Curated annotation (Swiss-Prot):
Primary gene name: truA
This protein's name: tRNA pseudouridine synthase A
Gene Ontology process terms (BP): tRNA pseudouridine synthesis
High-level lineage: Bacteria, Pseudomonadati, Pseudomonadota, Gammaproteobacteria, Alteromonadales
Originating organism: Shewanella pealeana (strain ATCC 700345 / ANG-SQ1)
Entry annotated with the keyword Metal-binding: no
Gene Ontology MF term list: RNA binding; tRNA pseudouridine(38-40) synthase activity
Length: 261
């Protein structure tokens, strides 16, 4: 039987999603909890492997199991065995053709900026603090150059293992709610560090250090060294993964919780 789960986690205490030797990861914690409930070893596959310090409100995973359990066992039962900063949000038995990564048609991330002179105390691991006068309208204007299928070499990590730098950005918006600025971006897929590298460069525009057209120029240059530094990890959230409607997966609010959808 193949089961899909919606997962939420605070990634600030983990060395990323993917299981690694001798460090604490979200995947390892989730697999341990699932294995307890299933009474057999469970291995999960995820929609997107988040880096150290990155969060998720809309991560999707799937796994195979011989165990027959009620839905509450895969939600409440698994949550009892998880640390407080990881939670199952929903469960659904899916067809064998479903794959959390390969049947996904799009991913959506939100990057949360706390724009204030003083750093936050609460939410310090859930937002990235950037002081100074940030013009979010210029960031939004510059971000529109990212739309469509393009070569994102200037915004990929140096050690990115993808075979191609081309990705298709479906939509991107930069909005403000008081002291919070949200960079909301949806694409068919993302390169390693792509969102954080984009945000780092958009911030240069918002702070007035670069022109709106600079983003267009960076895309044309296809050179990571010409773009800005990578933005901090703690403001980044994987908020949604899109699948064909035929799978009828649950739809929940995107989050993070302090955002008004």
């Amino acid at each position: 039987m193949r089961v899909a789960l919606g997962i939420e986690y605070d990634g600030s205490q983990y060395f990323g999603w993917q299981r690694q030797a001798e460090v604490d990861t979200v995947q390892e914690r989730l697999e341990k909890a699932l294995s307890i409930v299933a009474n057999e070893p469970i291995a999960v596959h995820c929609a997107g492997r988040t880096d150290a310090g990155v969060h998720a409100t809309g991560q999707v995973v799937h796994f195979e199991t011989n165990a027959i359990r009620k839905e509450t066992a895969w939600t409440l039962g698994v949550n009892v065995n998880l640390p407080d900063n990881i939670a199952v949000r929903w469960v659904k038995v899916v067809d064998d053709e479903f794959h959390a990564r390969f049947t996904a048609t799009a991913r959506r991330y939100r990057y949360m900026i706390y724009n204030h002179q003083l750093r936050p105390g609460i939410l310090r691991s859930g937002v990235s603090h950037y002081p100074g006068d940030i013009d979010e309208s210029k960031m939004h204007q510059a971000a529109q150059y990212l739309l469509g299928e393009q070569d994102f070499t200037s915004f990929r990590a140096v050690h990115c293992q993808s075979n191609t730098p081309f990705r298709c950005v479906h939509e991107v918006n930069v909005t403000r709610q008081g002291m919070y600025i949200c960079v909301d971006i949806k694409a068919n897929a993302f390169l390693h560090h792509m969102v954080r590298n984009i945000v780092g460069s958009l911030l240069e525009v918002g702070l007035g250090n670069q022109s709106v057209e600079w983003i267009e120029q960076l895309l044309a240059l296809k050179d990571r060294n010409k773009a800005a530094a990578t933005a901090k990890p703690n403001g980044l959230y994987l908020v949604d993964v899109t699948y064909p409607e035929s799978y009828q997966l649950p739809k929940l609010s995107l989050g993070p919780l302090f955002m008004l959808d």
